[in-house]
Amino acid sequence: MAGNAYSDEVLGTTNWLKDKSNQEVFSFVFKNEDVQLNGKNIGWNSYRKELQEEELKSLQRGAETTWDQSEDMEWESSVDELTKKQVFIFDSLVKKCLFEVLSTKNIAPSDVTWFVQHEWGKDQGWHCHVLIGGKNFSQAQGKWWRRQLNVYWSRWLVTACSVQLSPAERIKLREIAEDQEWVTLLTYKHKQTKKDYTKCVCFGNMVAYYFLTKKKICTSPPRDGGYFLSSDSGWKTNFLKEGERHLVSKLYTDDMRPETVETTVTTAQETKRGRIQTKKEVSIKTTLKELVHKRVTSPEDWMMMQPDSYIEMMAQPGGENLLKNTLEICTLTLARTKTAFDLILEKAETSKLTNFLLADTRTCRIFAFHGWNYIKVCHAICCVLNRQGGKRNTVLFHGPASTGKSIIAQAIAQAVGNVGCYNAANVNFPFNDCTNKNLIWVEEAGNFGQQVNQFKAICSGQTIRIDQKGKGSKQIEPTPVIMTTNENITVVKIGCEERPEHTQPIRDRMLNIHLTHTLPGDFGLVDKNEWPMICAWLVKNGYQSTMASYCAKWGKVPDWTENWAEPKVTTEINSVGSTNSPSPKSTPLSQNYALTPSDLEDLALEPWSTPSTPVVGTVKTPNTGETGSTACQEAQRSPTWSEIEEDLRACFSSEHWKSDSEQLPNLD
């Protein structure tokens, strides 16, 4: 197809139809019948009453513009003005019905694909074809749509009827329109149940092969069948002339024709064995797609996010088992197709990354309290959550109470959503809740005891089978584990016997994060949006959640004795560039002097103010009285007055120092 041989409108319409060639839509037909009420004849052209609503007037003007722009200038149409006006009114009423049904379903018109064409048939007279569909449409909703459109269509026809009718006659006309179904839906009859079911059609094929091939009506009254005008959601066919419509149909047919046609022979026995999906199966599949799309992983989430489908299944025979099996398929789909890191990352609001500061998050502040490189720690955790840690498949937060272990683990588990919890109280089936999950959470882990081998297999990301209560054994696929504890879980005791042979294998399976800094009582919880933003920040800045990226950034794979403090982070909390940083003026804090020398109080000088944020490793830990490491204390301890005096003597000569000393005021 040569690009210069056809107009942009023709090529644009052809490509638009090709993009939507396989989109399934409903096919409706709007019509009216000749009615006689108490001697009053009401025909197809008896609905020319002036429309009062502004929206209907706007739709009518749009139909008039479409008619004028699509007329061929080479010949003049002889359709009379009354026929044109009737078609314009019908077009506005049909679109008004569609928009009202969309508003009841809270569907935006921009999310819907539709096509409307008014035609005249030799036997049927005037009728209007409507194709409509979108992502929120399902085959099971077809009959509901027909009923709603039938109600709105009958109501608006009565409103537009130009024949003088009494209130009782108007009600009767509306009843006739609803009972005779002046809005019909394309259906098919099931061979076994003998019931009618909605038949969806392919949007692009239906428009190109059927509607665009028809001739335009140019006489009044119409002698042959054809179309008056058409419009669509993409504004592609509205202004096309008859010849351009035929050209689009031909180009579409040529482009969509398969190069080779495979012929298959189906025997009568195979046809008999052919299985057609029931309405119930279609409904379950549609519901399952919505649950996976919205990441529903629990009955409570289902009740809150999809109450209609939950009630529909609950009302069916065996509804509880149906709910349980549907939810199990949903969690299995998420566990097999997504990692915990993927589920966290997709919740991130990337538009806020511009003003996002990693150092100001509560998680990184907890790590910074220990003098660690919080970027390195978060990068290692993300690698494990993305199943890239290899045998080291478990993130272990351990240390004293109130150091932030559980709040970090809770934030990660909440961001993942599809989480299974280890139940230590269930001695026989502790992993009953851990199948088909993206993350396993072990809270307050203790002595593994006789379950140590099963624990080691799960913590290393192996595929094992576990026993379930009241069921057979079930397989657990490689799943990341996040664990918190106050105890030394590397020491395994079975009965009264200590088993040291398990210590090193357990360490080889753990990402060791030892938290020792007690948090203040007003520290607060980690925000639910914090970890999605952390993951998005890491990806944006080149810290991919793979072990290859981790080794390229930090040199080696993390082990049990990993030094999280090296290399030093370039921008610390409350440093210049952070939102909590102090003003960049010369203060003792900017010179790494954390405390006021006690000698200044004896000299009656104004003491230095204590900084609001202590330097890591210099101030005693609250509640415990423990100090930081010896290296940090030596590097950042406060200078004494004698040391300052020695520095001053070194800066000035002895004569200058003596003359200046004689001029000092008497402080006593």
From Swiss-Prot:
<dbReference type="GO" id="GO:0042025">
    <property type="term" value="C:host cell nucleus"/>
</dbReference>
<keyword id="KW-0347">Helicase</keyword>
<feature type="region of interest" description="Disordered">
    <location>
        <begin position="571"/>
        <end position="592"/>
    </location>
</feature>
<keyword id="KW-1194">Viral DNA replication</keyword>
<dbReference type="GO" id="GO:0052150">
    <property type="term" value="P:symbiont-mediated perturbation of host apoptosis"/>
</dbReference>
<comment type="function">
    <text>Multifunctional protein which displays endonuclease and helicase activities required for initiating and directing viral DNA replication. Also plays a role in viral packaging and transactivation of several promoters. Binds site-specifically to 2-3 approximate tandem copies within the origins of replication (Ori), unwinds this hairpin region and nicks one DNA strand thereby initiating the rolling circle replication (RCR). Cooperatively binds Ori with host PIF and probably other host factors, which activate the nickase function of NS1.</text>
</comment>
<dbReference type="InterPro" id="IPR001257">
    <property type="entry name" value="Parvovirus_NS1_helicase"/>
</dbReference>
<keyword id="KW-0255">Endonuclease</keyword>
<feature type="short sequence motif" description="RCR-2">
    <location>
        <begin position="127"/>
        <end position="129"/>
    </location>
</feature>
<feature type="binding site">
    <location>
        <begin position="399"/>
        <end position="406"/>
    </location>
    <ligand>
        <name>ATP</name>
    </ligand>
</feature>
<feature type="domain" description="PV NS1-Nuc">
    <location>
        <begin position="21"/>
        <end position="259"/>
    </location>
</feature>
<keyword id="KW-0067">ATP-binding</keyword>
<feature type="region of interest" description="Transactivation">
    <location>
        <begin position="543"/>
        <end position="668"/>
    </location>
</feature>
<feature type="region of interest" description="DNA-binding">
    <location>
        <begin position="1"/>
        <end position="276"/>
    </location>
</feature>
<dbReference type="GO" id="GO:0003677">
    <property type="term" value="F:DNA binding"/>
</dbReference>
<keyword id="KW-1121">Modulation of host cell cycle by virus</keyword>
<keyword id="KW-0378">Hydrolase</keyword>
<feature type="active site" description="For nuclease activity">
    <location>
        <position position="210"/>
    </location>
</feature>
<keyword id="KW-0238">DNA-binding</keyword>
<dbReference type="GO" id="GO:0006260">
    <property type="term" value="P:DNA replication"/>
</dbReference>
<feature type="short sequence motif" description="RCR-3">
    <location>
        <begin position="210"/>
        <end position="214"/>
    </location>
</feature>
<keyword id="KW-0805">Transcription regulation</keyword>
<dbReference type="InterPro" id="IPR049901">
    <property type="entry name" value="PV_NS1-NUC"/>
</dbReference>
<dbReference type="GO" id="GO:0039645">
    <property type="term" value="P:symbiont-mediated perturbation of host cell cycle G1/S transition checkpoint"/>
</dbReference>
<dbReference type="InterPro" id="IPR014015">
    <property type="entry name" value="Helicase_SF3_DNA-vir"/>
</dbReference>
<dbReference type="InterPro" id="IPR021076">
    <property type="entry name" value="Parvovirus_NS1_N"/>
</dbReference>
<keyword id="KW-1079">Host G2/M cell cycle arrest by virus</keyword>
<keyword id="KW-1048">Host nucleus</keyword>
<dbReference type="Pfam" id="PF12433">
    <property type="entry name" value="PV_NSP1"/>
</dbReference>
<feature type="region of interest" description="Disordered">
    <location>
        <begin position="605"/>
        <end position="643"/>
    </location>
</feature>
<keyword id="KW-0231">Viral genome packaging</keyword>
<protein>
    <recommendedName>
        <fullName>Initiator protein NS1</fullName>
        <ecNumber>3.1.21.-</ecNumber>
        <ecNumber>3.6.4.12</ecNumber>
    </recommendedName>
</protein>
<dbReference type="Pfam" id="PF12117">
    <property type="entry name" value="NS1_C"/>
</dbReference>
<keyword id="KW-0547">Nucleotide-binding</keyword>
<dbReference type="GO" id="GO:0005524">
    <property type="term" value="F:ATP binding"/>
</dbReference>
<keyword id="KW-0460">Magnesium</keyword>
<feature type="region of interest" description="Ori-binding">
    <location>
        <begin position="191"/>
        <end position="195"/>
    </location>
</feature>
<feature type="domain" description="SF3 helicase">
    <location>
        <begin position="373"/>
        <end position="528"/>
    </location>
</feature>
<keyword id="KW-0235">DNA replication</keyword>
<keyword id="KW-0540">Nuclease</keyword>
<dbReference type="GO" id="GO:0004386">
    <property type="term" value="F:helicase activity"/>
</dbReference>
<feature type="binding site">
    <location>
        <position position="129"/>
    </location>
    <ligand>
        <name>a divalent metal cation</name>
    </ligand>
</feature>
